[in-house]
Design a protein with these regions (language model features):
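Zn2+-dependent peptidoglycan hydrolase active-site motif and core
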Residues: 54-56, 71-112, 128-157
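Glycine-centered loop/turn positions within well-structured domains
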Residues: 67, 99, 166
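Single-pass alpha-helical membrane anchors
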Residues: 2-13
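Acidic, glycine-rich catalytic/binding loops that coordinate metals and/or anionic ligands
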Residues: 23-31, 37, 62, 111-120, ...
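Surface-exposed, glycine-biased beta-strand/turn segments
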Residues: 15, 20-88, 95, 117-118, ...
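Short glycine-/small-residue motifs
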Residues: 124
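Short acidic, gly/pro-rich beta-turn/loop elements at beta-sheet edges
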Residues: 48, 102, 109, 167-169
């Protein structure tokens, strides 16, 4: 039973240089140990809340309040505060990517300018009254997500905790939609 919906929004702002030979897939971690269900994918969707955008710039992962959130990648914390539309938000950036963790607990584990490594605990899933998703229509009367998202991750996510194999927003969107 999930007591809360973590809305994990990944804003993909790639700054990868054209001559880079490094692969990204070995540098990324899944953000929630034991929680792999994606209830809402990157891209266009039916908005789960009235007035919200139909374009979703990240993925939603349901997890219980207090669940540890792990850094997807190594980098520097560039934002740790209240963010419009994202509730309490932490942003981690490196030379390749910028990742936003939205709707986290207001009791931040990291601060702006901290350096983090992939897999490090940076936050916890926040209480729903912090960011106003009370009466959120993500679940039906049986507690199941209502947006038709798959209950298993695409093959690019199945290598234990390894995550993300694309190098562009289009590949990222495609990978998330594969079943």
């Amino acid at each position: 039973y999930f007591s809360i919906m973590l809305i994990f929004i990944i804003l993909v702002f790639f700054l990868i240089t054209q001559n880079s030979n490094a692969t990204l897939e070995d540098n990324f971690m899944w953000p929630l140990d034991g929680y792999t269900y994606i209830s809402s994918y990157f891209g266009y969707r039916n908005s789960p809340t009235s007035g919200a955008s139909t374009y979703h710039s990240g993925i939603d992962i349901p997890a219980p309040e207090g669940t540890n959130i792990l850094a997807v990648c190594s980098g520097t914390v560039t934002f740790a505060s209240w963010g419009a539309g994202g509730g309490y938000t932490i942003v981690v950036e490196n030379d390749d990517i910028k990742v936003s963790y939205c709707h986290v607990s207001p009791n931040f584990i990291v601060s702006k300018y901290d350096t983090v490594v992939a897999g490090q605990i940076i936050a916890n899933v926040g209480p729903k009254n912090v960011y106003g998703i009370i009466n959120n229509p993500y679940k039906d009367s049986l507690g199941k997500p209502t947006n038709g998202a798959t209950t298993r991750l695409p093959f690019t996510f199945n290598n234990k905790k390894r995550w993300f194999s694309g190098k562009s927003a289009k590949l990222f969107q495609y990978a998330l939609k594969q079943k």
